[in-house]
Amino acid sequence: MAKQNLELKATSFTLSVLHINHNDLDIIAAELDNKLAQAPQFFLGAPLVLNLSAIQHTHIDFNALKQLLIDRNLIIVGITDASAEQIEQAKSMAIAVVKSGKQARKAELPERATKIVKQNVRSGQQIYAQNADLIIFGAVGNGAEVIADGSIHIYGALRGKAMAGAAGDNQSVIIANSLEAELVSIAGQYWLTEHLQQYDLSQRGCVRLEGASLTVESLPQ
């Protein structure tokens, strides 16, 4: 059989979602610069989906916003939760319109699977549980990344990065025997090390999303 020179296949990727809560580009630029300064390598060249739910009824200059992000080595690949006018603007600029996790969950979904890892996750390694929860019987070291579309349970120390609800599920949680993490994220909302330091990181804890903010709850050992 002759080899096909072009194939179209379905797959999925983990994308960061940037929630735009104001239409003033100067305010957006200042807040974005502050976030980028906290973790410049993590966001370098990152493809972003813009969530516009907070500004659906206001005008925003997409050309200027796109350039603002390009100037910071960020790339808009799509928008979500947008108004009809915003959708038309995005389409005219060849920006995709994607369904948010909330929209996607309107259809009945099968029961979520569980991916189990029975070893430590070391620096440079990445584990992704697609359409699944992730359970790790071991530690997640500095420089390692664990990602799940569902929740993440770590029976060991979390010292690297953990990203739960990667497909937009804001009910996902991160549980670990200790939370000395470089980064924790749920449904695109993230905290870096300095945000976590207000808690007792040596204790078993649970990171969850309450509204639009992360919170940490201590758990019994």
UniProtKB/Swiss-Prot annotation:
Pfam assignment, any one: MinC_N
UniProt cross-references to InterPro entries, sorted A to Z: CAP/MinC_C (IPR016098), MinC (IPR013033), MinC_C_sf (IPR036145), MinC_N (IPR007874), Septum_form_inhib_MinC_C (IPR005526)
Gene3D superfamilies: 2.160.20.70, 3.30.70.260
Entry keyword annotation includes Nucleotidyltransferase: no
GO biological process: cell morphogenesis; division septum assembly; regulation of cell division; regulation of cell septum assembly
Keyword tags: Cell cycle, Cell division, Septation
Family named by the database record: Belongs to the MinC family.
Function: Cell division inhibitor that blocks the formation of polar Z ring septums. Rapidly oscillates between the poles of the cell to destabilize FtsZ filaments that have formed before they mature into polar Z rings. Prevents FtsZ polymerization.
Record's subunit section: Interacts with MinD and FtsZ.
Protein name in the entry: Probable septum site-determining protein MinC
